[in-house]
From Swiss-Prot:
Matches recorded under Pfam families: MinE (PF03776)
BP terms from Gene Ontology: cell division; regulation of division septum assembly
Keyword vocabulary terms for this entry: Cell cycle, Cell division
Source organism of the structure: Nautilia profundicola (strain ATCC BAA-1463 / DSM 18972 / AmH)
Entry protein name: Cell division topological specificity factor
Amino acid sequence: MSFFDIFKKKKSKDVAKDRLMMMLAYERANTKIENLDEMKKDLINVVKKYLNVKDVHIKSNSNQDIETLEVEIILNK
């Protein structure tokens, strides 16, 4: 990363990726954050912006030692 990269506007895909990584980190740490639902909505909006989708669902699961964040994207035909 160069000094001038600081002033470049991030693409929405990069912002969505960063938010997803942040959500995963908080979910793994079992830390509740107040804006997690807002971040999930933002992620859904970015997916809908770039894909022709019918619906998008995001849910988190925890089984024993494994925690997952599941993203289900239903595409239009």
